[in-house]
């Protein structure tokens, strides 16, 4: 008997209304956003109620949902107005709130009935009994702690029917389930109340202090300044394991990331899910393309977190091992004229005549070409466009659509293609 596989939700981050619309257009089944209160991303361009309402209406056109993260740790007095806030979210049409603090969970459940509640990863759910506990309190979904292994995930799925949401991509906090007080000490900003200053990613000088007395600098003994941050997670080539083990929602981290990141990563995970559900062979055929695509937006090395083993020093960024993307995001397509094969693009970065670029769009469509016939908004032929947000026109040999993105190889790099169709990026 053939096993029927459930299609998991692709859940994307959206720090702004623009990013929400991009995520939905690029295949997100749901997006998670932050409001003006109770979240953990104070710098993410959080949504007003009016923006939430517009986002909900836009997502609905694509059959997508909007969740709101309200996962801060409550201190005395923070609860004032929470009930009214949750009722407003419910009335706007927010599909669920993502919460970790029991006080906020209680307030949402009692004062905004009908609003679905999901348990945040901050609550460190690592076993099925925990999921059953929260189910008894009315929660419908639990975001597993990032520290859960694939073996544990499979066992949890067998023993509970609570919806499971699991991270598949993005930054990994160096602290357990994100509960960090380093920012409190280093910058007087509470990471558990939205003020994380990412102190773990700062560069530090190390000193050897045996017995806490002598102070010897290790500066000459290590190659770079020390940091204590983790590499990023990527499960793009392990999507079959997530689907086979019954994960209900594949979560992508990154509400503060760019539309280049949101569009690329969402596009890839949607394509991965579609391909595997069509056939394992289809997934294997595009797997390497998906992995290669991820590296175009990666800013750190990528690993699989805790899913297959406990991370070692190889999964930590102890020095200057930052991944520098070879591509830069340069424009978004506004319109395309089939007759003249001309695209109107809104510039986001410097564009030069002759740049090697890649167009990509929803449905994992992409092709490479060169910038030709570059004109400014007044129709003047130009060799270089340095001003962001300017409308430009270029010649494009293949049809593109409004909302497609354009990325360019960074200066001094070119792609060389081999006879087997594979490419290698080299310095020009």
Predicted segments, located by residue:
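Glycine-rich, positively charged N-terminal anion/phosphate-binding segment
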Residues: 41-60
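Gly/Gly-Pro- and Ser/Thr-rich, intrinsically disordered tail segments characteristic of DNA damage-repair
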Residues: 80, 114-115, 119-128
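Glycine-rich loop at the start of a catalytic domain that most often binds anionic cofactors/ligands
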Residues: 44-49, 77-85
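Surface-exposed amphipathic alpha-helical tracts and adjacent flexible/coil segments at the periphery
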Residues: 1-26, 30-33, 37, 56, ...
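Alpha-helix capping/helix-boundary segments
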Residues: 103-104
């Amino acid at each position: 008997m053939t096993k029927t596989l459930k299609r998991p939700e692709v859940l994307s981050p959206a720090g702004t209304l623009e990013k929400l619309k991009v995520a939905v257009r690029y295949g997100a089944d749901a997006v998670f956003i932050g409001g003006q209160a109770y979240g953990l991303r104070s710098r993410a361009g959080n949504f007003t109620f009016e923006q939430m309402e517009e986002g909900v209406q836009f997502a609905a056109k694509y059959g997508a949902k909007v969740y709101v993260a309200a996962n801060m740790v409550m201190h005395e007095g923070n609860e004032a107005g929470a009930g009214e806030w949750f009722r407003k979210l419910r009335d706007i049409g927010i599909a669920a709130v993502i919460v970790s603090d029991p006080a906020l969970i209680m307030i949402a459940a009692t004062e905004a009935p009908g609003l679905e509640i999901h348990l945040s990863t901050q609550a460190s759910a690592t076993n099925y009994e925990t999921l059953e506990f929260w189910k008894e309190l009315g929660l419908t979904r639990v975001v597993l702690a990032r520290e859960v292994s694939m073996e544990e995930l499979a066992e949890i799925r067998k023993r509970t029917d609570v919806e499971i949401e699991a991270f598949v991509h993005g930054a990994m906090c160096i602290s357990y389930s994100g509960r960090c007080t380093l920012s409190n000490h280093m910058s007087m900003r509470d990471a558990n109340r939205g003020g994380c200053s990412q102190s773990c990613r700062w560069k530090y000088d190390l000193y050897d202090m045996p017995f806490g007395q002598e102070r010897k600098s290790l500066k000459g003994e290590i190659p770079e300044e020390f940091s204590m941050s983790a590499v990023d997670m990527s499960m793009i080539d392990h999507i079959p394991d997530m689907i086979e083990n019954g994960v209900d929602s594949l979560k992508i981290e990154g509400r503060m990331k760019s539309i280049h990141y949101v569009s690329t990563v969402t596009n890839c995970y949607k394509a991965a899910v579609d391909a595997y559900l069509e056939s394992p062979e289809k997934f294997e055929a595009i797997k390497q393309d998906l992995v290669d695509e991820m590296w175009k937006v990666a800013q750190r090395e990528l690993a699989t977190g805790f899913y297959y083993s406990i991370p070692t020093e190889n999964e930590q960024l102890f020095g200057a091992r930052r991944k520098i993307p070879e591509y830069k995001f340069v424009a978004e397509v506004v319109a395309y004229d089939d007759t003249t094969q001309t695209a109107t693009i809104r510039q986001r970065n410097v564009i030069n005549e002759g740049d090697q670029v890649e167009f990509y769009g929803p449905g994992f469509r992409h092709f490479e070409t060169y910038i030709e016939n570059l004109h400014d908004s007044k129709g003047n032929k130009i060799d270089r466009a340095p001003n962001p947000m300017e409308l430009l026109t270029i010649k494009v040999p293949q049809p593109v659509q409004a909302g497609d993105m354009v990325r360019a190889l960074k200066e001094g790099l070119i792609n060389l293609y081999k006879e087997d169709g594979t490419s290698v990026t080299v310095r020009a």
